[in-house]
Amino acid sequence: MIDLSTLTTERRNDETFNLDQMTVKEALVKMNNEDKKVAYAVEEVLPNIEPVISSAIEAFNKGGRLIYMGAGTSGRLGVLDAAECVPTFGVPATQVVGLIAGGDKAMTVAVEGAEDSLELGRQDLIDLNLSENDLVLGIAASGRTPYVIGALDYAKEIGAKRASLSCNLNAEISKHAEFPIEVDCGPEFLTGSTRLKSGTAQKLILNMISTISMIGIGKVYNNLMVDVKPTNEKLVERSKRIIMQATDCTYEEAEEKFNEANQDVKLAIVMLLTDCAAEEGKTKLVKANGFVKNTLN
């Protein structure tokens, strides 16, 4: 039998014992007060997040991937963060990957027993052709999900880097990772509902890992997402605005270079900043490893 009594995420919150008796306003205030604790809890583990980001940058530079593994809410958050990297940073969907126990179906409905399988976590990475250049980040609020542990153990066999993210101290998955992150947000507002504070903490940390690792491989210039992919009308206009912000050019100039660059925002910026044609701009970016700033030297 699994003993959940030692897990912070399963403890009852002293502040919400009478939750069912609260008015809507009282419950809102209590919930908001609990949520305020999350960012401070994340702040405590920044030193543990830093090496994970460094490892992700190293993986990308070797042609490897960042692979999120989780079940339930943890898995869904990984899939969400991975999916957002494609339009935001212009990376292929294969570079940041989110895997959830039970597969795509588990994004919307619970898949019975999927998270309890060590073998399933292993098999999902085999199917992904895991390599030693990859970084596997196992996510589990409880810190004990077998699916995640199976994945981390297989990653060790292959020689891939291993990180973990849990919301309990002394988590089991931490023993299976080189770079463990244990963020303690205290008991949930609703006992055991880890989609709340734990999920929020996980989302904040995944945001940090994906965003800052992308900065580390040249996907950002100043604080602008210069590799954004203009896949809809809103993003086309945002792309032109980014070009204007990066170069202090007019809308008309931004639009002209955007089109000359075949809607490549980063290339258009380099063309404007260095006064060059598209082909020369491409060469400059290759030599600069994709960093806009390095094309200006």
Curated annotation (Swiss-Prot):
The record, for InterPro entries, names: Etherase_MurQ, Glucokinase_regulatory_CS, MURQ/GCKR, SIS_dom, SIS_dom_sf
Q: Which residues form the SIS domain?
A: 56-219
GO BP: amino sugar catabolic process; N-acetylmuramic acid catabolic process; peptidoglycan turnover
Catalysed transformations (reactions): N-acetyl-D-muramate 6-phosphate + H2O = N-acetyl-D-glucosamine 6-phosphate + (R)-lactate
Pathway of action? Amino-sugar metabolism; N-acetylmuramate degradation
GO MF, one annotated term:
ether hydrolase activity
The UniProt record lists the EC number as 4.2.1.126
Enzyme class name: lyase
The UniProt keyword set, sorted, is:
Carbohydrate metabolism, Lyase
- Give the domain of life: Bacteria
- Output the Pfam families linked to this UniProt entry: GKRP_SIS_N
Active site (UniProt): E84 (proton donor), E115
Known function: Specifically catalyzes the cleavage of the D-lactyl ether substituent of MurNAc 6-phosphate, producing GlcNAc 6-phosphate and D-lactate.
Q: Identify its protein family.
A: Belongs to the GCKR-like family. MurNAc-6-P etherase subfamily.
What does the record's miscellaneous section state? A lyase-type mechanism (elimination/hydration) is suggested for the cleavage of the lactyl ether bond of MurNAc 6-phosphate, with the formation of an alpha,beta-unsaturated aldehyde intermediate with (E)-stereochemistry, followed by the syn addition of water to give product.
Self-association state and partner proteins as the record states: Homodimer.
For this entry, the protein name equals N-acetylmuramic acid 6-phosphate etherase
Identify the species of origin: Lactococcus lactis subsp. cremoris (strain SK11)
- By which gene is this protein encoded? murQ
